[in-house]
Amino acid sequence: MIKFLLFLAIAAATVISNAELAVPTASISAHVLDISGGSPAGGIQILAFILLNNGWTNIGSQFTQDNGRVDWVSPDFTLIPGTYRLVYITEPYYTAKNVESFYPYVEVVFNIRNATQHYHVPLTLSPWGYSTYRGS
């Protein structure tokens, strides 16, 4: 029985380690904070695009977790140098809270020149404004 429990503990640690390693260094993550309430904004859909041949190509769609984070917005896409766009769909978030908001969505367009780096794109949000920056 002790050997079996030890096996389960090692297996669980392996799964946790693999989950932590699943997100590559070359990736885009996001974080949404609702500054009007001072809390993370869970449940916001984030769409990811890359500009290819003068048009936007969808490379991923994720929802923020309860902590407001998306660890990897485009898990099925390998980063390449280029222009990217994240679209944070904010209207359903505020509608669910019965709060009027000015922006139905927020678009953030940015350049990736070094596709081997990690890019973190946080959004601080309120019903009447927003701000974004390159995080770490």
UniProtKB/Swiss-Prot annotation:
Note: HIU hydrolysis also occurs spontaneously, but more slowly.
Natural source organism: Caenorhabditis elegans
Enzyme Commission number: 3.5.2.17
NCBIfam families: hdxy_isourate
Keywords, in A-Z order: Hydrolase, Purine metabolism, Signal
Example GO biological process: purine nucleobase metabolic process
GO molecular function, a single term: hydroxyisourate hydrolase activity
Subunit structure: Homotetramer.
Task performed by this protein: Catalyzes the hydrolysis of 5-hydroxyisourate (HIU) to 2-oxo-4-hydroxy-4-carboxy-5-ureidoimidazoline (OHCU).
Pfam families listed in its UniProt record: Transthyretin
Family, similarity comment: Belongs to the transthyretin family. 5-hydroxyisourate hydrolase subfamily.
Residues reported to bind substrate: H31, R69, Y133
Reaction equation(s) it catalyzes: 5-hydroxyisourate + H2O = 5-hydroxy-2-oxo-4-ureido-2,5-dihydro-1H-imidazole-5-carboxylate + H(+)
Protein name per UniProt: Probable 5-hydroxyisourate hydrolase ZK697.8
Keyword Signal: yes
